[in-house]
Amino acid sequence: MKQLKAFKYRIYPTEEQQVLLAKTFGCKRLIFNHYLNEQQERYKNKEKHLSNYDINKDITNLKNKMEWLREVDSIALQMAAEDLSVAYENFFKSVSGKRKGPKVSAPKFKNKHSRQSYRTRGVRVNEDGTLQIPKLKAVEAVVHRTIPENSTIKSTTISRN
């Protein structure tokens, strides 16, 4: 039987890595807000909303217009699009009564003071106690709980306290 477990580690990024993390937080917020605005405009014009697939395809076009989006982890941008799609899915299910639990409001724009975090995939724990995070390389971390052998890291959330 497979189990999902969560582990929380504190990381100690270098100055360079801190700058890249800040850029990633900002780019994730930009993608979320850009496509939230796009979805709202489509809703007002009674057009079909963009699927997660359509948004991910369009992120490539957006990267061609805004070259600095290429500096950050592309998976983080895709996860932002996925978060928006899930938020809309939960909202529409809530409105139609198909969602269990409390009613959910429509997705809201994120601001600079919102929780700064992003999700990514492809993270590894190295033997020397560092975390291998995409675009950040090896980041110093306090690995106080070892990850069991034969287990895989499905996704990782990086957040600023």
What are these regions (language model features)?
Residues M1-N161:
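Nucleic-acid substrate recognition interfaces
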